[in-house]
Design a protein with these regions (language model features):
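Conserved HGGG/HGGXW glycine-rich cap/lid loop of the alpha/beta-hydrolase fold
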Residues: 20-77
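Short beta-strand/loop motif that positions the catalytic acidic residue
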Residues: 222, 228-230
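Conserved alpha/beta-hydrolase "acid-adjacent" motif
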Residues: 235-241
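Catalytic active-site module of serine/aspartate enzymes centered on a nucleophile-bearing elbow/loop
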Residues: 251-282
C-alpha cells in the first residue's frame, strides 16, 4: 500500500541520516512510498534547493522521490571527495543507510557520472536509470578546463548562460526555472562552500580524462535500461556524448531536446516528464 507523504517538493522537510562511514547525509523525500524509489543525484556545486520543483513534483506524482546532498555539499557532513568513484561509494552508503537495496536513479550532469559508476560497480542497486546532460568517462570535450569556481559568484548568469541557449524561448524558460527555484521560503539548504565546489571540479575533470585503454569499456558493463536526456545545444557536456552513451550502453534510448543546453529537462519539462514517467513505469 502506498503511504502518502509530502505532496510538493517546495514543502518537503529536510532530514539527515547517518551512513555507516559516519557521514551525516542531508536528504528530502516527496511523493508516495511503496514502489521502487527514484533517487536524484545533482549537478556541479548544487544542493537540494537547486532541483527544479516542476521536475521533482512531476516525477513524484506517482512515486517516491528522494533528493540528497553529496558528501561535503550543502547540509551534508564530511569532506567532498575529489573523484567520482569516491562520490559513488558515499552515495551507495547513503542508500544503504536509508535501508534501500534497489532504486531507480536519475543523475543530472555530475550525477550522471556518479550513476554510471554505481551502475557498473553495484549493478544490483539500480532497476532503471535516467542520465541527463552527462557523458561517459573520458568522453568527447569533457576536460572541463573552461569551468571555474569563480563563475559561482554570479549563479544567475551562470545558469542562464550554461543551462539555456541564447534564444528568446530558451531564456524565457530559464527565467521561469529561476523563479521556481525561489519558491521554497523556509528550511533552505546550506550554500555550497567554495572548497567543496573546488573538490567536485577536480572530480569531474578526473572523470573527463581520456584513459590510456578501453575508453568506453565501463559502459558495456552497465545493463540496466537507461533513458538518456540531452540538450541538442549543450555547451557544458557536448551532445555527442549522449550519442556515445546510447551507442555503448547495453539497453539505452536517447531523448535529444531541441534549442536546449544543459538544463534541457527543465526547458522542455512536459516532454521530459512524459518520457521519464513512461520509461520508469515500463
Amino acid at each position: 500500500m502506498n503511504t502518502p507523504t509530502v505532496s510538493t517538493y517546495s514543502q518537503a522537510p529536510s532530514d539527515v541520516v547517518r551512513a555507516a562511514n559516519g557521514i551525516d547525509v542531508a536528504y528530502r523525500r516527496v511523493g508516495k512510498r511503496g514502489d521502487t524509489p527514484l533517487v536524484l543525484a545533482n549537478y556541479f556545486a548544487a544542493n537540494m534547493d537547486d532541483w527544479d520543483p516542476l521536475i521533482v513534483d512531476g516525477l513524484a506524482a506517482d512515486r517516491d522521490v528522494i533528493t540528497f546532498d553529496y558528501t561535503g555539499i550543502g547540509s551534508s557532513g564530511g569532506v567532498t571527495p575529489a573523484t567520482v568513484a569516491e562520490v559513488a561509494v558515499d552515495c551507495v552508503g547513503f542508500l544503504h543507510a536509508l535501508g534501500l537495496t534497489t532504486v531507480d536513479f536519475l543523475g543530472f550532469s555530475v550525477g550522471g557520472m556518479v550513476a554510471q559508476q554505481i551502475a557498473s560497480s553495484h549493478p544490483e542497486m539500480f532497476r532503471r536509470m535516467i542520465l541527463c546532460g552527462t557523458g561517459p568517462r573520458g568522453g568527447e570535450k569533457m576536460t572541463f578546463t573552461e569551468l571555474s569556481i569563480d563563475e559561482l559568484n554570479d549563479p544567475v548568469a551562470l545558469l542562464l548562460n550554461s543551462f539555456f541557449t541564447p534564444s528568446g524561448a530558451s531564456q524565457a524558460a530559464g527565467h521561469a526555472y529561476l523563479d521556481r527555484l525561489n519558491r521554497r521560503a523556509a528550511d533552505r539548504d546550506t550554500p555550497v562552500a567554495m572548497t567543496a565546489a573546488a573538490a567536485q571540479l577536480r572530480a569531474i575533470r578526473e572523470w573527463g580524462e581520456v584513459p590510456t585503454a578501453g575508453r568506453y569499456a565501463m559502459l558495456s558493463t552497465i545493463r540496466q535500461p537507461t533513458l538518456i536526456v540531452h540538450g541538442a545545444n549543450d555547451i557544458v557536456v557536448d551532445s555527442v556524448n549522449a550519442m556515445i552513451l546510447e551507442e555503448n550502453l547495453c539497453d539505452a534510448r536517447l531523448l535529444m531536446l531541441p534549442d536546449a543546453s544543459h538544463g534541457a529537462q527543465s526547458q522542455h519539462a512536459d516532454i521530459f516528464l512524459a518520457n521519464a514517467r513512461l520509461f520508469l513505469n515500463s
